[in-house]
Design a protein with these regions (language model features):
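Low-complexity, Ser/Thr/Pro/Gly-enriched N-terminal "stalk/linker" regions
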Residues: 1-65
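Residue-level detector of alpha-helical secondary structure
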Residues: 9, 13, 17-20, 50, ...
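Short, recurring structural edge motifs at helix starts
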Residues: 31-34, 78-79, 126-128, 184-185
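An alpha-helical repeat/solenoid feature that recognizes helix-turn-helix modules
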Residues: 34-56, 81-101, 130-148, 190-194, ...
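Well-ordered mid-protein domain cores that form the structural environment of catalytic cofactors
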Residues: 64-125
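Extracellular polysaccharide-recognition and catalytic grooves
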Residues: 110-351
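Extended polysaccharide-engagement surfaces of secreted carbohydrate-active enzymes
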Residues: 237, 241, 252-538
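Beta-strand-rich recognition/accessory modules
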Residues: 534-591
């Protein structure tokens, strides 16, 4: 583990060395070529510099005075023309990383009086959030009290409110990144649950009141442990981790590693599970290291000609965040020491289960995870709602998310592996929620997952009352998948169009792990078993040169679409079925 800690610190040093020159004299950050700043880069830089100082106690790096750079970036974030809760929260914890009392904090000493007053005012101002922004409120509160800007500590109250919202929004105790839109379906259970717990735990570690930290850790543990139990089942043999929702890719890897290492440091993981979690961290890290790090120059790449990511993240933000995480991992690993000795490498497990995130009279939401070591088929099938800013994407659609095998374009909507039905101005998809979600073992040990939608829902996440209903049945046997969709309408209605798309991608030409899964020459081996809509396969569309068809890991080259583009009168009482099967030819990227 000591060697791992040093490796993390060396990587952090390399990444920071490549990015500190981007900090301007006024503390703003110059972007990578072909990117624009988001206004939060300075805060992320400040926190990364602070974490590096905590890990090394060094105040210079490659001739840069880290104290001056931290002061500059914190000042820039404090006076950012637009309000950025995240950037401010990161900047405030960056300040706190250099010392919890302002009279002993070298960065506070360097801040001019207008900056101090601005920080005091901004850290006091906060809105009440139901989503992951509440974690930023907690970070700001920790900084304000610990630095000594306030004698009243609101951190405990804010953490209690964060946990209460989890109870209100999830019957199973998972974090719903609720947005302010009230007319759409809630239930955005994604990686922001993990990242929120990681951020809050990191903030508490910097809190001046150790007693408060210990009191609140017990409350946080009851919820965070749910993700700790989930993550090992999500990680593929090639190390690919969280694979659905927004902001995954490198962040899916980094957040998953962080929450596991934090839990090991805090003793939340049983010693009997040391082999499982050590193996999980190793796989996640190796995938992260090879897939996202430029080995020659030592910096992170999350967006280029072949891959893409969430528009709220830039390569510059990702580099500072990666440096911060690596410094954090180095400290955590040293703190863990030999408390979790690993004796054996666990054998690959066969996994097939549905994790229920929320169940009420109105909806059920969750995640079906599947791994078959013999065939290499591994995927995550989400039944969750999209965040309002990600409605026009495939990130939350209910299909088997399996990077390299069943892929989808980032920041672009299309009906990947689900039927899309258009009735007038309403576009219907069987995603986002279900009722009567069940898993069972059928004939010949076939694992089945099914759910119903008594009310159809639009791709925007709004219930389409009065049109009809849908039943969805998935069946899995080794490396083979069958899916069936059964639609019924409440009264005669005209269907304008139905379409169903499949994406064929390739791994990144440079940044890829040789053992990552990808499609072989025989592709998906897709077959239409039943089609009451009488749709036809369109000519395969070549999209290799279109920048809108990039994934987190590589480029999509072809789109195959099954479509009926002329009207069909659907009649009450008749079931309309669409059934397909897949048996993907899975191989290694460098086979």
């Amino acid at each position: 583990m000591e060697n791992f800690a040093e490796q993390c610190l060396d990587m952090a040093r390399s990444i920071l060395s490549q990015n500190l020159d981007a900090i301007e004299d006024n503390g703003t950050i110059s972007p990578f070529p072909n990117e624009v700043t988001t206004g939060q880069e300075s805060g992320h830089a400040a926190f990364a510099i602070g974490e590096y100082f905590r890990a090394t106690n060094e105040d210079t790096l490659d001739g840069h005075n880290l104290f001056d750079l931290a002061a500059r970036t914190i000042t820039a974030q404090a006076f950012s023309p637009e309000s950025h809760e995240g950037g401010l929260a990161f900047a405030s914890l960056g300040l706190l990383s250099f010392g919890s009392a302002k009279d002993r904090n070298p960065i506070w000493e360097r801040l001019l009086e207008p900056t101090r007053l601005q920080l005091d005012e901004q850290l006091l101002e906060r809105n009440d959030y139901n989503n992951h922004y509440q974690a930023f409120n907690i970070g700001k509160s920790v900084a304000r009290y610990s630095v000594g800007l306030s004698k009243k500590d609101e951190t405990g109250k804010l953490i209690d409110r964060f946990l209460e919202r989890i109870e209100e929004n999830s019957s199973s105790g998972y974090f719903d990144d609720v947005d302010s839109t009230t007319n759409k379906l809630s239930g955005t259970f994604d990686i922001y649950g993990v990242s929120s717990f990681v951020f809050i735990r990191q903030a508490l570690q910097l809190h001046a009141n150790i007693n408060l930290r210990e009191r609140k850790l017990a409350s946080l543990r009851t919820k965070a442990e749910k993700y700790l139990k989930l993550i090992p089942d999500m990680v593929r043999q090639d190390g690919t981790g969280w694979s659905y929702g927004r902001s995954i890719g490198a962040y899916g890897q980094m957040c998953s590693i962080s929450i596991i290492l934090q839990a090991m440091r805090d003793g939340w993981i049983s010693k009997t599970q040391a082999d499982l979690y050590q193996d999980t961290v190793k796989k996640l890290f190796l995938n992260f290291f090879i897939t996202y790090l430029n080995q020659e120059h030592g910096y992170l790449v999350i967006r280029d000609d072949e891959r893409n990511t969430d528009p709220s993240y830039t390569n510059r933000i990702a580099n500072f965040d990666a440096a911060r995480y690596l410094c954090q991992w180095s400290r955590l690993i040293r703190s863990i020491g030999n408390n979790y000795p690993s004796e054996n490498t666990p054998k690959p497990r066969k996994i097939g289960r549905f994790i229920n995130f929320d169940k009420s009279s109105k909806k059920e939401q969750g995640l079906f995870v599947y791994q078959d070591p013999n065939s290499g088929l591994s995927f995550q099938l989400p039944l969750v709602a999209p965040n309002k800013d990600h409605i026009d994407s495939c990130d939350y659609l209910a299909f088997p998310h399996a990077p390299g095998i069943f892929d989808w374009p980032i920041n672009k909507y299309m009906p990947i592996m689900i039927p899309e039905l258009t009735f007038g101005d309403k576009t219907i998809i069987p995603a986002y929620y279900g009722k009567n979600c069940t898993t069972k073992v059928g004939m010949r040990n076939t694992l089945q997952f099914s759910y119903e939608q008594p009310t159809l829902i639009t791709k925007e996440g709004v219930f389409a009352n009065g049109i009809g209903s849908c039943k969805v049945n998935w069946a899995f046997a080794g490396g083979k998948i069958n899916c069936e969709y059964v639609f019924k309408v409440e009264s005669q209605i005209q269907l304008n169009r139905i379409r169903y798309s499949i994406a064929i991608s390739a791994p990144h030409s440079t940044y890829r792990i040789g053992t990552s899964f990808t499609l072989g020459e025989e592709g998906h081996r897709a077959e239409v078993l039943k089609d009451d809509f009488q749709a036809q396969w369109k000519q395969t569309e070549t999209v290799s040169q279109d920048p809108n068809y990039r994934t987190h890991n590589g480029k999509i080259h072809y789109i195959q679409t099954l479509e009926r583009d002329h009207p069909l009168i659907m009649r009450k009482g008749i079931e309309y079925r669409l059934a397909l099967s897949f048996e993907p030819d899975i191989t290694f990227a460098d086979a």
